[in-house]
Amino acid sequence: MPVETISIPVTSRFGVTVYNVLLAHVPPTGRLLVQLPGKGYTCQHPLLYYLRQAALALGCDVLSVEYGFQAANAELDVQNAAYLMDDVWGAVRPVLERGYRRVCIAGKSLGTPLAGELARALETPEVSLILLTPIGGALQGLDDIPTLAIIGTDDALYSPEVVAAFDQHPRITWKVYEGLNHSLESGGWRASLAALPEIIGVCEAFLESERA
């Protein structure tokens, strides 16, 4: 199935125009994956790059979002952090006009609370979440939204208590990887590469489970 590349420009309050990328199948499939990156972990880093490839192979269109502070090489602080959701909505709104019936939002670190906020606000019939190294209150208030949460035990933000607190949630599935850090990598490149297909495979299975 052919895939076209569509640029989604967003005039950001960080003072730049960001050109987000939508990879869309022809003809449309009705399924969308939105990628919300981390602060320093963009959509071109391994986890999000290969998740994009897996999602495309499953027939999802993929919107890869870039934040204005990243394009502007600006510092993110308490005052301008509120602009992030403006960047996200600026990219997502015109894409949703294509009429998707199923949307999965994949957030990495900084992108995880933004993903949760977006998921709660969408009026799309079916919405799900992939939270890669969730931070803050990203898992709060998700209610009946199907969610896959992934973290490593060497992540400074890993908390067995937090995992346990959501262990009985009927719609949240945790995958905890021994020895992986906040980038879901290990100390050596071989171990990091070995972990990558397993993580992407879990995400792929989750997307398949949400497949029409």
Functional labels for PLM-detected ranges:
Residues G38-K39, Y67, L129-A138, G152-D154:
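Active-site nucleophile loop of the alpha/beta-hydrolase fold
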Residues V88-P146:
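Primarily recognizes the serine-hydrolase "nucleophile elbow" in alpha/beta-hydrolase
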Residues S159-I172:
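Conserved loop-alpha-helix segment in the C-terminal half of the alpha/beta-hydrolase fold
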Residues L180-A195:
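Catalytic histidine-centered segment of alpha/beta-hydrolase-like enzymes
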